[in-house]
Amino acid sequence: MEGKKAPRGKKNTNNMEVEDISKIQENAKHTIKYKYTTFDELKEQGEYNFFGIVYDASFPQEESSTSESDKKKNVTKYFCILKLIDQTTNCLTNPNNFNENVIYLIIKSTEKENIPFVHNIGDIIRVYRGFYAPKKKRNIYVNVCKDNKIKGSWCLYSTNNNSSEPYSCSNKQFSVETQDKQIIENTKTWVKNYLNIDKSLKYPLQVNLINRINDGNDNDLLVHVVKKIELNDQIVLFIQDASDGCELHTYKYYNFIQENDIIRVRSYKVFDNNNLIINEFGNILVLPPYSNCYKSLINDMTKKLKQIK
């Protein structure tokens, strides 16, 4: 009696059907849904998908200069600028020419909620369809349009938890693919190791708090939040570093800041009684406790207290 033939598309005793091989090859193509580009691979002008790590960020702003067509349509545009690094382009890989290599991500939209409000240095951003157009700086532009007609999109991920879900996103219909989860997990591990290294963060405009008045330049601070008070429409942060202390008055947008946080105050100005407010294009970003900058400031303040005692 003749044995039964193996069904088409299933394994024979000695070989595999061509149809099965084709299916495996086709499935392999779909395992990687998106191609992501690292910053050292950005050479030619064009559209790219990528992951970046937030090194610095401005607060979402209304764009002052709009086109004549926008004025006629009464269209308001918003934007923010993020400085990004990755495993291939950062303060350690480019110590002598970092500012020439850091990525400037400019995100624009007609809806303010589509502009990212970054909370922490070291947060991860995923960008789809960012347009790389290098000029004097390495700029990438993302336009998030009104009425869900999205030319580009972004998602923000915190490095302070183990979740692969974003805490903020420009597109409510975002997806997190299997490849994304692996990239996010690996990037979080890298960020924690990187920020723990000395000189992994360099902010040339940073000054000591005691020099906040003497220097009229547009400078930055790295300070410890001693106390936080919530008022009607604002919060008051009592801040200090190893040199001095004062008050920082700001809006409730920054209510995510907690007592004992170490924060980067990006662009400030002094007002009544030597207190501070944030400049128009300034921002406040929280430093993660595993970062070297965080630990260094705590050590400096501890030494200062011991000297006083």
Where would I find each of the regions flagged by the language model?
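Single-stranded nucleic acid-binding proteins centered on OB/S1-type folds
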Residues: 1-309
